[in-house]
A protein has these predicted regions:
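Residues at the starts of beta-strands that form the adenosine-phosphate
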Residues: 154, 158-159, 317, 343-346
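Short catalytic-loop micro-motif centered on adjacent basic/acidic residues
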Residues: 130-131, 160-163, 319-322, 348, ...
Length: 463
């Protein structure tokens, strides 16, 4: 007679074998915490973990599945190679596109200005308008934006709206019937209940971008929902403070390529040939902006790598604004070592975020970083901005949170700014938020609190 232990062992063994084969044959480099969590879960709770792994276990997609545009850089002479900055060398090694010039940068001081810039972007589109968002709200702002998109399509502009398949359920189920009737193309990225996407339903598209005529880009951390634009003191609810920007320039063309790839993956259609050919770049540097996409469609974890590099190369200061702070041990150590080297590290997070588990998971990292000498500021608002500044040499601003889900699982999009004047503008934005924040004071955690924090950190890669 077969015992319960035999059945348990058989299922656990099957799960571990499939996990090992899947990771090896697909060459999936998993983060250590994720690998350990999957291994222990499959060993102890195979009945739960095995089905979850089949649905959520994949971390990278093959390039054959996800049609990918490649950049190759011209070979530099020995003399010019000496003059190339370390940031440029790293970007090339990661296969990122070129740094390009930009014009008319507008860093939105609040939600009202962000919405005004978005409305202008939609209204001024003449040929194409591509929008990617994690959440499209069933609310006042969502309705207002829908009306503008419908009007845009009715005047002959090709309008495409890409919404994450999971994010669609988070802020009310919006009906897009009227938009489609107006001529707007609507697609959902990896819907969670689509069986053909088995193993990929955990890959969320967290990118936020609006591209008009492949020449104007609106991007940052805001979703297209009312609370992301209502951050004035007049509101009775807790303010959501976010950071977006817009500008003109060639970077919008690079963003279009990323959108085309995401759209093709969501609709299962081929990318137009003009957007899917290898691009050869000259060796010349331009001190401007660079698109930094990251996610399952990239062989490297680009944003994570740039953050690690920034921590180790910073000489004077590091500024971070993020809603969730659940770094992996490597990134936390890099920040602590920066403190020990005398680098001024300032971290701005909300006093309490909209994710209770993320707040519990962050406690250990906050205590350790504060003890290393960092200044940690607690914003009374629901800070949703994502910005990382390293000296006056690099600012990364966009959609990525400082947690393992954003850095290792989600499709994310950041913009790297290299001009010191612009970097100082983003620094000033963070400092303004700090003025309303209180300084974090670490408290010693008891045994039960540490146990609870440890259990939550065990699944931190899924938060």
């Amino acid at each position: 007679m077969t015992s319960w232990f035999d059945i348990h062992s058989a299922i656990a063994l099957l799960g571990l074998v499939i996990y090992a084969l899947d990771s090896h044959t697909r060459r999936k480099r998993r983060h250590p915490s994720a690998a350990i969590a999957w291994f222990i879960s499959l060993l102890l709770l195979p009945y739960v973990a095995f089905p979850l792994y089949l649905f959520f276990g994949r971390r990278k997609v093959e390039l054959a599945e996800y049609q990918h545009k490649k950049y190759t850089h011209a070979k530099d002479s020995k003399q010019s190679e000496i003059n190339i900055s370390s940031n440029e060398k790293l970007a090339r090694a990661l296969g990122l596109g070129p740094s390009v010039k930009f014009n008319n940068l507008n860093i939105h001081k609040d939600g009202a200005q962000a919405l005004q810039a978005l409305e202008a972007c939609i209204a001024n589109a003449n040929k194409t308008l591509d929008i990617c968002t994690f959440i499209f709200g069933r609310d006042e702002s969502g309705y207002q934006i829908s009306q503008l998109l419908a009007e845009c399509a009715q005047r002959g502009v090709k309008v495409r709206l890409l919404i994450d398949g999971f994010g669609y359920y988070l802020d009310g189920l919006v009906s897009f019937k009227l938009l489609k009737q107006a001529g707007v193309e609507v697609a959902f990225f990896a819907p969670p209940f689509k069986f053909s996407l088995l193993g990929r339903t955990n890959m969320r598209n967290h990118r936020k971008l609006v591209i008009a005529d492949r020449s104007h880009l609106w991007s940052g951390g805001r979703n297209l929902s009312h609370k992301y634009f209502q951050d004035t003191a007049s509101t009775k609810k807790k303010q959501w403070v976010d950071l977006t920007f817009n500008f003109d320039g060639a970077l919008a063309q690079q963003a279009t390529i990323v959108f085309e790839q995401d759209w093709a993956f969501a609709t299962q259609k081929a990318i137009p040939k003009k957007h899917n050919t290898a691009t050869h770049l000259s060796a010349q540097q331009t001190l401007g902006v660079r698109l930094v996409p990251s996610g399952p469609d990239r062989s490297e974890d680009t944003i994570y790598t740039m953050l690690i590099s920034g921590c180790y190369t910073a000489q004077d200061h590091i500024l971070i604004a993020t809603p969730y702070f659940v770094p992996d041990p490597t990134l936390l150590t890099a920040l602590e070592l920066a403190c020990h080297r005398g680098v001024r590290v300032n971290l701005l997070v909300p006093e309490s975020s909209n994710h209770v588990l993320a707040d519990i998971a962050r406690r250990f990292a906050l205590r350790d970083l504060a003890q290393a000498g960092a200044n940690i500021w607690l914003s009374p608002s629901m800070l949703h901005a994502k910005a990382f500044v390293f000296d006056d040499t690099l600012a990364l601003v966009g959609s990525a949170n400082l947690d393992e889900r954003s850095l290792f699982l989600n499709y994310e999009l950041m913009v790297a700014f290299y001009e010191s004047r612009v970097i100082q503008d983003f620094s000033s934005w963070i400092y303004r938020q700090q003025h309303a924040a209180s300084l974090y004071k670490p408290r010693r955690a008891g045994m039960w609190r540490e146990l609870a924090e440890g259990l939550v950190r065990w699944v931190a890669f899924q938060l």
